[in-house]
Amino acid sequence: MDKVKVEAPVRATEDPEKVGEAVLNVFPELEIEVEDDAVRGTGDSGSLRNLQEVLEKRRIRLTARNILKKHLRDNSTWFYINKQAALMNRVNVLEESISALGDILVEIESDDIMGLIDWLAPDVSVPEDVAD
């Protein structure tokens, strides 16, 4: 079973609804709860569909794959997405939180975590026609 958890802190200077909007820009299929201190969401691998498409369009699958594999632990992995960029409908995948306002933490669990990583961010370092 696949499980996706997302959490984004809400700082005192931020509007919780805007933080929720940032999360939904990247994960439109996610069920979220907007609270004063954080936006939290849960879903399954289907909630990653939009992210998968964006990674392909922006040609950052290999970067994302490297981060996902670096943080691989048993049947889970995690990464961050820049919250400010997400509000502007952009995806910047991060190894660690770098923004003073905090970034969106994404945690993924799966019985087949490598299969999920291969789907979300396939290894595109070798073109398919060369690999054969």
Swiss-Prot record:
Which InterPro entries does the UniProt record give? PAB1135-like (IPR002739), Ribosomal_uL5_dom_sf (IPR022803)
Record Gene3D superfamilies: 3.30.1440.10
**Stored PANTHER family:** UPF0201 PROTEIN TK1335
Q: Which family does it belong to?
A: Belongs to the UPF0201 family.
Protein name in UniProt: UPF0201 protein MTH_433
